[in-house]
């Protein structure tokens, strides 16, 4: 967890920022972190960073376009030095809040905060943002971010008392709350909404900046129509992929490979891990000549790094029990064989 001093420093940055620009990861932890901080100060715009794993110089066009006075980076493990140098050149402060197991940036121009580096716990950025904003009315937004990132926060019972109709009673794991409750369904609606056109994602974000409570998301009207439509479309495809993946259980390993126009790998990996607790889950999405991989299981980070070791161009990393990797499809057989040996 961040220290009280660090939390106060971030609050000061937020209060000072008159036109902040938030870059955040393309998942519920990133989205809800942005929403919690934007709703706290009532200003600022958000940019979803779909490129993995870093915020690179190509993203700076949004800075040139929107002319912010502050840059906040949320839930991203890497930021390119070229991006930092350009912000420095433009005299724009950068506040970077993360929770991944990575080294702090060497460039001290960046105000860097990482919950993993503080005590090794690595609470999600949505949890940190909730503690920073300290707005009880947004407890449900924070909870969505936390359970989506496999973290059961200390405010779960408080949430359950406020929204008993949405909560699962006494969940044993974060994914119990995510997959066996109504707040979990709302989380999946938002997650799938992020996988839409840029225009629709921006409209969803604008709606979420003003929404007063979770039930508004479930009410079908002109504002929520596209959000719910996207969920229905993707959920149908997602359930079919799940059914196919469930067949691929072998000993300790569940390995599933698929293709298509859209990656749902981390969603599939999370739910399969929930359903098959004792299995090591590997979900591979193949697009042209690249394989994007989501991995879930004990020591997933060590297994991932060992499996991609010495594979040219391969990248990977993440948390202890949840990681991602990217490599050329020609190297997939080698990667799969290594994983099988490491988890047998």
Language model region names:
Residues 154-240:
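Accessory alpha-helical/coil subdomains and C-terminal extensions
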Residues 217-277:
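Long, well-ordered mid-to-C-terminal structural blocks that present hydrophobic/aromatic surfaces
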């Amino acid at each position: 967890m961040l220290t009280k001093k660090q939390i106060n420093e971030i609050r000061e940055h937020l209060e000072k920022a008159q036109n902040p620009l938030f870059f955040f990861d393309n998942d519920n932890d990133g989205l809800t972190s942005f929403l919690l901080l934007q709703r706290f100060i009532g200003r600022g715009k958000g940019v979803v960073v779909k490129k993995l794993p870093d915020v690179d110089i190509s993203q700076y066009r949004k800075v040139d376009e929107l002319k912010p006075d502050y840059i906040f980076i949320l839930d991203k493990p890497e930021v390119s030095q070229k991006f930092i140098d350009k912000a420095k050149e433009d005299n724009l402060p950068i506040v970077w809040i993360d929770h991944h197991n990575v080294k702090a940036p060497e460039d001290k121009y960046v105000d860097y905060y990482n919950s993993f580096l503080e005590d090794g716990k690595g609470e999600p950025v949505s949890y940190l943002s909730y503690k920073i904003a300290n707005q009880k009315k947004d407890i449900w937004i924070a909870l969505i971010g936390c359970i989506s990132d496999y973290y059961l926060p200390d405010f779960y019972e408080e949430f359950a008392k406020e929204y008993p109709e949405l909560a699962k009673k006494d969940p044993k794991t974060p994914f119990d709350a995510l997959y066996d409750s109504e707040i979990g369904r709302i989380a999946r609606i938002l997650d799938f909404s992020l996988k839409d056109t840029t225009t629709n994602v921006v409209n969803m974000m604008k709606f979420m900046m003003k929404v007063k409570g979770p039930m508004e998301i479930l009410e079908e009207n002109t504002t929520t129509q596209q959000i719910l439509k996207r969920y229905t479309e993707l959920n149908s495809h997602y359930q079919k992929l799940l059914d196919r993946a469930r067949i691929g259980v072998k000993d300790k390993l569940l390995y599933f490979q698929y293709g298509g126009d859209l990656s749902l790998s981390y969603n599939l990996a999370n739910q399969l891990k929930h359903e098959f607790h004792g299995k090591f889950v590997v979900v591979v999405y193949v697009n042209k000549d690249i394989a994007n991989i989501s991995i879930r299981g004990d020591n997933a980070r060590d297994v991932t790094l060992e499996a991609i070791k010495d594979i040219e161009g391969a990248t990977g990393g993440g948390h202890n029990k949840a990681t991602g990797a990217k490599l050329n499809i020609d190297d997939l057989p080698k990667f799969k064989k290594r994983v099988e040996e490491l988890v047998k």
